[in-house]
Structure formats: structure tokens, C-alpha cells
Amino acid sequence: MNIARRGLAALVSAAILIPASVEFADRAISTWSFAELHRPKEAIWLTWIVEPLPPAAAIILALAGLAVLGGWRPGYWSRVAITTCVALLVAITIKEQLKYAFGRTWPETWLTPHNPSWISDQAFGFTFFHGGQGWGSFPSGHMTAITAPVAVLWQALPRLRVVWLALPILVAVGLIGADYHFLGDIIAGSYLGTACGVGVASFALRKAAA
């Protein structure tokens, strides 16, 4: 299957899975997580896997830029590292714009002033271009930030694909367990991050190998 067909298959599957989750699964899973799991600390810890990645990517790119100005020419593995960082930062930039565009409320209320949520207010839905942190649930930034670099590393280091698969699964489990995101947010963030990672890697790594 060539890249165009894979892209089309991804779009079709996203167009099916995300609306299906929003309509049939999101509220039930959030309600179950809130009532049964009570946000265990282990779930919160799993979401922290993502936290160091954006600042680390920014620092690595800044250092790489300074090194290039000093005459350094990166080899293949250095290009992999740079590509991973670029994919991550591109993905989270796009994610922020999509959060604003979709304006989805959160599963729970944790902001001041009070943000409307499913658990507290039975608020559920999208208010397009609303803006504000209380309307930023979709897509999941955590899943976007973990799947973008993983998509690059999946191609560059195929021997470690078990690790690359495990990382987003762990983050997703943490997000569901902590009731930080609806399942639909998680699916959407996964597609976004993967698309950014595959796209950046297809250009940068293929060009480097040429």
C-alpha cells in the first residue's frame, strides 16, 4: 500500500472512529472512570510521560541550530533526532489551532473560573471557535505529543517498535484512568500526531537517505 492509499485509509478510519466514539463511547467511559477509578495516582503518573518532550525538543533544536551555524553537519541519526523534534513541535502547534477550532468541553471541571464539563454540568459537545481553556479538550495534546515522535521513531528504529507502541498506549490508559480526556479526543490526537510524524519523516529522512 503506497503512502497515498495509507493516507486515504487513515482519513476514512478517522472519519468513522472519531464520530462513533463521540456519539457512543465518550460519555459512558468518562462516567465510568469518574465513578469507579477516582483518578488513581498511577494514571496521573502515566500522563507525565509526555511532559518533558516539548521543552526537550525545543532545546535540542536550538542546540542543533547553533551547532549548524558553527559548521556541524548532522549525520543520519542526528537527522532522526532533529526530525523527531520537528514533528513534535509541528504537531503541538497544529493541535493548539484545532483545540480553538473545535471548542470541545472537558470531561471534568478543574479550571478557575469553573469550566463546563460532562461530569459537573452534563455539558457535552463542540462550540466551534469558542476559545478559552475550558473549550480545549479536542484533540488530546498528550496523545498528539507522544504519537508524533513515536511515528518518526517507528520508521527509523523498527527493532524497537514494541517500545514505540507501548508508549502511546500507556499515555492513553493514563488519560482514561485520570478522566483527563474523552476517548474521541485520544483517538483524534493519535491520528494528528501520527500524521505529523509520518509526514515530517517522509520528507526529512527520505531526503537524508537520498
Spans of model-derived segments:
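N-terminal transmembrane-helix/juxtamembrane module of multi-pass inner/ER membrane proteins
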Residues: M1-A64, K99-L111, N115-I119, F129
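Membrane-embedded catalytic cores of phosphoryl/pyrophosphoryl-handling enzymes
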Residues: N2-I3, L8, W118-A210
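Aromatic-anchored segments of alpha-helical transmembrane domains
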Residues: I16-E23, L88-Q97, P168-Y180
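Hydrophobic, aromatic-rich transmembrane alpha-helices
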Residues: I60-G71, I146-W154
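Interfacial segments of alpha-helical transmembrane regions
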Residues: G65-A101
